[in-house]
Amino acid sequence: MSQLTPREIVHELDKHIIGQDAAKRSVAIALRNRWRRQQVQDPLRQEITPKNILMIGPTGVGKTEIARRLAKLADAPFIKVEATKFTEVGYVGRDVDSIIRDLVEAAVKQSRERETQKMRARAEDHAEERILDVLLPVARETGLQMDSIEAESATRQKFRKKLREGELNDKEIEIELATPHTHMEIFAPPGMEELTTQIQGMFQNLGAERKRMRKLKIREAMKLLIDEEASKLVNDEELKLRAVQNVEQNGIVFLDEIDKITSRSETSGADVSRQGVQRDLLPLVEGTTISTKYGMIKTDHILFIASGAFHLAKPSDLIPELQGRFPIRVELTSLSAGDFVQILTNTDACLKRQYEALLETEGVRLEFTPDAVKRLAEIAFAVNEKTENIGARRLYTAMEKLLEDVSFDAEKHHGDAVVIDAAYVDKRLGDLAQSEDLARYVL
């Protein structure tokens, strides 16, 4: 993260998301500010809190994609949650504190994967030795003389060479492997998650690690042994400690569909999943301490990014206290036909390239002409205007319908080039786009 300036972060996001420059700039600055804060000396560092972001824009314009790509760039603990999944404390459903518990779980998993990767080379060596021990029992254990030991060592090196070159991959061996711990899930009422985690930990620690003999091919045994050896080399306590610290200093929470928990003035009735959830979110966003099975987590420096379409509600419908917790507001614009053309062709994993790669696996060479791409974008845009505007997601539907015949009869086109031009697009989608009723149900 320290290597990326805001301009470089925006450049990376441009590879995957078309337009929405204001939103990209805001998240880039917020991400860079995490690193800047780390360079400030205490006690001032503790006073610098992240400025949370509220992204406002219609569906399918890139709100979720911006958050998803940002998480990959940050390489920080990240979780995306739907605000509608939570209920006020005391009601049936998940309470908002579980957001932080899930974030810590994600951080522990991320730290474990990182540490395991560091230890992989050593784990591979240990796994290799264990397989060689099965193939060639150690000479000293069998009571052989020194010259026999030297001969055994030479044989071991020959087998090691064969093992590394993959010549023994399909050979079956019987090897002792640790049996994985069975995770027992205990469901508890809201507010008793701490007790639940303690009970789970107690049951997991009851049985010692058991081992059993398994008959496997060397290829499969090697994978399992590498994982087992790597887990032995990782210090679990240090790992959890670093994960907790990482969450507190670099954690990012993306709250999607926050507009769905607004309480509109014209509606009446229970607001279990609306104002109650907003009130519960307040301390979380402001800064509080949450109890998890890995210890107490302070949320003061966790960055919250909220997003919503706000079709039926306005940001001002959020309770005033929560509005104040999201000082940076960014409005995302609807996508034009020109944006659709760029989405189809200019991003790193554009739709056109994805379908070309998929059909290439069956020997079909798909070729899109520029006028076909333009016509497809125009049709998708027109359908969005006539019916519900679902943004770039309309392109997925249109592309599936366009290539339905080619995908179904791919074997007939094996070794051929299938050219998609404007006439082909009109033939497949023209009538559907012109009929509003058909477009509503098919596109």
Swiss-Prot record:
Main location: cytoplasm
Binding, ATP: 18, 60-65, 256, 321, 393
UniProt GO cellular component terms: HslUV protease complex
Classification via Pfam families: AAA (PF00004), AAA_2 (PF07724)
GO terms for biological process, alphabetical: protein unfolding; proteolysis involved in protein catabolic process
Keywords: ATP-binding, Chaperone, Cytoplasm, Nucleotide-binding, Stress response
Molecular function terms, GO-annotated: ATP binding; ATP hydrolysis activity; peptidase activity; proteasome-activating activity
Localization per record: Cytoplasm
Complex formation: A double ring-shaped homohexamer of HslV is capped on each side by a ring-shaped HslU homohexamer. The assembly of the HslU/HslV complex is dependent on binding of ATP.
Protein family (similarity comment): Belongs to the ClpX chaperone family. HslU subfamily.
PANTHER family associated with the record: ATP-DEPENDENT CLP PROTEASE ATP-BINDING SUBUNIT CLPX-LIKE, MITOCHONDRIAL-RELATED, ATP-DEPENDENT PROTEASE ATPASE SUBUNIT HSLU
Function statement: ATPase subunit of a proteasome-like degradation complex; this subunit has chaperone activity. The binding of ATP and its subsequent hydrolysis by HslU are essential for unfolding of protein substrates subsequently hydrolyzed by HslV. HslU recognizes the N-terminal part of its protein substrates and unfolds these before they are guided to HslV for hydrolysis.
Annotated protein name in UniProt: ATP-dependent protease ATPase subunit HslU
Organism listed in the record: Nitrosospira multiformis (strain ATCC 25196 / NCIMB 11849 / C 71)
